[in-house]
């Protein structure tokens, strides 16, 4: 192999040190490159991060006491070369001098810490430690802005991240040791706030600057992509890998040693391609190279084997194509076979290169053939693969060493032990026509991403969910935001994320808190499941807006409420989430009794303090619900008496105070459901099928259960009125509460009109179980310390303005705006819960109705406009009501002989009573259309007339000697021969249907001999033949009414009117003076607006007809066309008569049969 050939290849793989040539299996010394230093730091951070002096000294020895001006120059030069921009001399010298100053200060800081650590109670050393911290902190605050000089942010980025890392480590020191150094708690808390804030500031600056630099390198040519990929690889190692560790500096989130992993992949270089040999169009473009070489986001995989195929061009044999077999984390037996990369050449026998979880390939020595005048192919002639116990060679070894870009992380040991990366895959860029390109590109993962997800018994273990072995349908892996150390997972619809297998390495059983790092565009819920029941509900509070870019501030932690004890060495987990949630990783935090008690106490203290608007507990925060106060109370009650009895008592008093404040601001009467229908004008009113139940594992206090109904006109309901005296003018109020589960639950707030939502909430054992096991205590009480859905104050069903209600949410809220108030009118606000379906049900409690905020601006103008419109329509309703009431009253009065309403007119029949009843029911707003048991503005006059209608029915029933003459009770009191039916037609009207000529219906009736009676029948005949109603005594005295569907004249016994004339005269005119005929009586009056309904028409409220179909169907409908009422006079001679109904052919339909005693 000649030196010239080597030199053509090396510069494209070793740009930071073009003269370095690595030939042997052991790495030759090449100086302290950026990759050397960065990977050493990454190893130190990810493997040896333990609070204390060891970390401080280690950071000094590794970076700040070791790297001098020449090394800082290398940091700057590496990026300068990639972006073709040299930092101006002033900015360069300023940056290096500042870095030197930080090194000097940190050396003094470290020596002072060593001295103090040996004698921590020495006052002088404590004071010196405070001084040196202040000096170090001030120096960093002054230096870091100078490392992001405008226009040179990209070139300075790799030194900026080093300074940022140092600053965060120093702030962590003071958060841990500050009070022992003599700082007051307020100062320590302030520095801790700086720490958490700067984690985001430094992270976002690094990611934004990296992305800017990468975008600026985008081009169109293949050579542009080579530089682009180098920048991506090198700054991933020197910048992004380091900032991925930054969250671990948070002392409260990570108080003990933490095991972290990097799952990102980096790609080495393509073989050299001289783009001047052929026209530019002959070569792959920038985008083609990116698409072919860089794999799309995927679950982490590990190399099992390569199958390499050899191809040739002229006399040159080269790597022509390959297959990759790989496996996912924890599943070595389920191999994943890649598609064929390149071509399946047969110049030589295929070569298989193997790897395994315990024997990875950590180094390659490649022999590149660059595309130039001497070589017709840009490709690989041979590669040596080194694993931790041996080596394998494809054709021959070469000089291009992967260690030049991915050096060992520990040079103090053999490379087989101190390596930093594993080979995980190889992609391929191929060009057949024109210049031949067979570019194999190796991709590598950091060794911290182990093939087995091991959970430590003594450290916090972070496992990225991208290390799942199976991706669920509907879930996707997306490109990480740059600071997570790899890709992340999400879903575009509700469902599982993917199966993650872990192995517990310590003695079992072992308990862990389970925590997730996530981002969410809205308040979401999820379920954490594994092979042992139960499942655990988890909340994902909103951290970002939809459409917003993922930043460091977008990510937060959410923790299961209680620890989980694992007794098996291997478990498989899955996470059920909604769309808009991004999952980075799961974290296992080991606990023991003392640690758990400390965690629980800290959690309870934070939860209690978070209830109030200030430290003096004078007021509750608006978003703190009554349900949440109960849950915080449970949290306090679950504290250990053994470890924190005094703190528990203090917190308990604060929670009780919070509960009293919650009761004071709640405008509902009896919010804890001491009873329903206890007082006529106060508290809750409800249907009889509602039950009140005592507290359980979900509710601490009473809650109500609503069941389904078989008739939507008779729903299950619960309601209460908020009196006008409790309301403030021009104020928004909020109804809220907690729903354990519900189906078809309708919630209303009614003032000017209805705010309405239908809420379906899966409950226990469904999508998000709260406490699947529902364990009980020793006395049968619910165990509220069991795992359940952690409360999230924003996880609600908030229906405000034009927003839609987020269903499937246990917390709900509904707003309503109040305009001016009038105590005389006492409009108030109606609160209604209703179920009108058979499958409907609900369990709800902790209901609140409270003042939210005064109305201003657009909201104020909107409610004023709506209120005016409502009042205008109320005036129209009054005009309508006056007209309808007058007509209804006339119809009712016409039924009776006098104003005492104690006697019916002689010719009043059942149809006339029905007609009058229907006209009474045409009075609008007698009851609320949303719930017809609640009186409306016209309830008084409606009930007045409806009472007289009931009197008319009673008097009618009393004088009609035929029992069940309207068939409302079916065939009761009637004797039946053959087949007949009673059918309900036109809603409330029951009719007798005689379908066969042999059928007969009869009734024996007791009468007074010698007195006169009127037999009146309303009926309809279908088809041919006649329908007959006969009245007779035992021997003789028979009379009959016949009904026929005919056109010719037909004489009825005792009546000379033909059927057409009878229908015309008696069926209409006979009653027109009383009720204007049955059909006409229900027509709309043209003087009344037919589409009237009081409406609050603004966007936040429903507009249109507030109609209740059940209300409209009340009263009896008119007889359809074709029905005839006929009557005859009958004078019985004995005390018993028979009334018989039959027909000769077709179908005979009878609406009513009356036998009325004539007045003397």
Swiss-Prot record:
Single biological process term from Gene Ontology: symbiont-mediated killing of host cell
SUPFAM superfamilies: delta-Endotoxin (insectocide), middle domain, delta-Endotoxin (insectocide), N-terminal domain, Galactose-binding domain-like
Molecular functions per Gene Ontology: signaling receptor binding; toxin activity
UniProt KW keywords: Sporulation, Toxin, Virulence
Domain of life: Bacteria
One Pfam assignment: Endotoxin_C
Note: Toxic segment of the protein is located in the N-terminus.
Function: Promotes colloidosmotic lysis by binding to the midgut epithelial cells of insects.
Classification via PANTHER family: ENDOTOXIN_N DOMAIN-CONTAINING PROTEIN-RELATED (PTHR37003), PESTICIDAL CRYSTAL PROTEIN N-TERMINAL DOMAIN-CONTAINING PROTEIN (PTHR37003:SF2)
Family: Belongs to the delta endotoxin family.
Protein name: Pesticidal crystal protein Cry1Db
